[in-house]
Amino acid sequence: MSASTHSHKRKNSHLFPQRKSSNSSMDKPFFPNNDSVANTDPQSNENGHTINEIRPTEATIDVTDVPQTPFLQEQYSMRPRRESFQFNDIENQHHTHSFFSVNKFNRRWGEWSLPEKRSYVLVFTLIALSVLVLLVILIPSKLLPTKITRPKTSAGDSSLGKRSFSIENVLNGDFAIPEDTFHFIDPPQRLLGQDSDPGLYFTTKEIDGHTNFIAKQLFDETFEVNLGGNRFLYEGVEFTVSTVQINYKLDKLIFGTNLESEFRHSSKGFYWIKDLNTGNIEPILPPEKSDDNYELGLSKLSYAHFSPAYNYIYFVYENNLFLQQVNSGVAKKVTEDGSKDIFNAKPDWIYEEEVLASDQAIWWAPDDSKAVFARFNDTSVDDIRLNRYTNMNEAYLSDTKIKYPKPGFQNPQFDLFLVNLQNGIIYSINTGGQKDSILYNGKWISPDTFRFEITDRNSKILDVKVYDIPSSQMLTVRNTNSNLFNGWIEKTKDILSIPPKPELKRMDYGYIDIHADSRGFSHLFYYPTVFAKEPIQLTKGNWEVTGNGIVGYEYETDTIFFTANEIGVMSQHLYSISLTDSTTQNTFQSLQNPSDKYDFYDFELSSSARYAISKKLGPDTPIKVAGPLTRVLNVAEIHDDSILQLTKDEKFKEKIKNYDLPITSYKTMVLDDGVEINYIEIKPANLNPKKKYPILVNIYGGPGSQTFTTKSSLAFEQAVVSGLDVIVLQIEPRGTGGKGWSFRSWAREKLGYWEPRDITEVTKKFIQRNSQHIDESKIAIWGWSYGGFTSLKTVELDNGDTFKYAMAVAPVTNWTLYDSVYTERYMNQPSENHEGYFEVSTIQNFKSFESLKRLFIVHGTFDDNVHIQNTFRLVDQLNLLGLTNYDMHIFPDSDHSIRYHNAQRIVFQKLYYWLRDAFAERFDNTEVLHL
């Protein structure tokens, strides 16, 4: 691997052209002849793939009355378009980074779930250690490399007079950092020249006591368009905006109101179209309005969005897909078979949770000429039933049925359909997959070429298929057998379409993909044509492309921008590579200082890559700025008033001067078998050399996940360190991500085997090397979800030798109870891996829990992800053994995130104070009773 040393060339505009209106390229009517589809004969290509016509019909409508939600929530989506946004507390012109995030399966709920009204997004700071603070006593350690961070101090400052903080400070938002709203508005097509990119974005502003949406430009600071407020009246009823989408011409908006969360990414709500030329706001509705008890004829939709070129609005109602032209106001029904078992353009539970990570299953051609959508058939999938307990108006329990396939049981089946907007015909696409195939991704390479990925049921064999619409040709361009590297197929990152460039004699579309190379590391590969089977590897090395992967592309210089952990496995930086140069040699450029090894950056680029949102997330105070890409690469060196400072951290920096913040070190330990394990050590600011300290081990450990990085944090673990005077270790066992398949593949077919062994060995070695500072009678472990499972498996293995206390939140206790796609991806089916399921990966030695001084178990009753059945089975086994050395807290009607009815605050208070009592030995006199 070599990094090029040439400077990245960029254009500077002296004159900026007037922004032109984007006219639709669509000149044929939507669903011509006023019919849903036209009668055509099926077409067959040379491979025998058949495209069949479907004739949709009209639908009836029903709506559920729900309370209005007068605040905005943050929305995450796999869609390439970014103009749909949700915010916390729309009444303020900025939102707030928060204290807090908790891991769910694959780290996803902390990243993607809809936060509560005052939920703050993780905020945090652990600032570089000042060499002037000589009073700090560090734990001796032979473990290198190490990075230590702590508050910066002035020459006259010391830790005297500073105080510790507790979980209450975290929950009260004492460390919250306000952040201005900033979101790029995507153009209707990729901007190929930087001179045509004004850096159009929207923000919010308080005007006369009301929140207004404002469109602005990074190029022209004087450009400002008021798009209206976040409240409006319809038929005399006031509605408050929860989500907003803005088209590039700034003449149409889509609002979402009254949103009710369903699962991790999905919700239902009312959607509206606003015409900025007239000021009119009308509901987006199916053709037949409902008789809702709002008496307004409104319908709750799963979502509503602009198409990429802004010619259409598409939405899902009652699991059917609808389309309407932006200016027509009349929706057409595309599908007719939507039901509780059939999902059109919308994933079912398992596809939303484990595969697509989105509330949508539709992929638009970039010019709006066509769209492909998926239909999921859950008819044969078994239900789980979740009860609601807290409805005071119900004498009998209400329940919710969710289609939830478990290992070895029936999975949903999928079909793909092509909607041709130019002739109004809908075709079925013969994917060539098997009955139990899984659809992993879809993306248009060009306006006429659709690429998708499918695997076998066990996610071991991947087929990448490309379908060319004009020729009706379908080819499998890549086949990956993960059995060859003892791995599995994971959820994939989006590809980047590369357009033709005649001046370079590039006449065809191609694309950049991210997948493992021959050494097992995830890298960039260039496929020069849509049907190319042999790619050009662009990056190489014992590191991986991480985060969102490709974050931007500059057409003029053929430069690709991506994030990776090349400098350090726990950090992340921005890189670029020239597509032209890299066809002959592997040259990529680090765009940030390589000596800043522990920095963790994330970027979001504008369409032409001229402008960027730069987010430095650690290890120091988080900073978020926006401006020209070349001027926001290093936020520490920004002294330019023209750069937008989005984080407002003045009060935060002033407040933390009053606290002794913990010291964080990033370390590596080599185990007895030669495997290298990364971990984070968090210590109190002022260690007493005469005192022995408890240890809390924090673990997640899910296969392919990377939970512990150099992102800064002032959250639960830091509160434990500061308020309870505890040392925290955060350990990444083998099987986790970021280090290639040689490290990741240890988890295959034996979840819960290597994680507890690595955790136990790291903890023991740490204690041995620092024995003079460690109280070995007070060693605890905790985790949430997969982390709860790992904690319990560690206790089972350790049998009280090292760990004396454990806390498990929403844990899996038996993998036959979890969902099929996630579990079989790593474990195969139970009939194929009996030993793995029933001997290695289940918790079965319940007698080992007798050796604990105390166990704390927490779960929510409405957990649609890890069902409370897992916890009840565990507790039942403890009861059968007569064990009473455990505590349990059940949260009624809370899902996997445990947030319902003030639960999020209470769960962390419970964990914190339970741990306080444990380390104060208040449980030690409790006898373990036996039957």
Swiss-Prot record:
One of its GO terms (biological process) is response to pheromone. The chain crosses the membrane at residues 120-140. Residues 1-13 have a biased composition (Basic residues). Pfam families: DPPIV_N, Peptidase_S9. Gene3D superfamilies: alpha/beta hydrolase, Dipeptidylpeptidase IV, N-terminal domain. Residues 1-58 are annotated as: Disordered. The keyword GTP-binding does not apply. InterPro entries: AB_hydrolase_fold (IPR029058), Peptidase_S9_cat (IPR001375), Peptidase_S9B_N (IPR002469), Serine_Prot_S9B/DPPIV (IPR050278). Residues 1-119 are cytoplasmic. Its main location: membrane. The active site is at S785 (charge relay system), D863 (charge relay system), H896 (charge relay system). Belongs to the peptidase S9B family. This is Dipeptidyl aminopeptidase A.
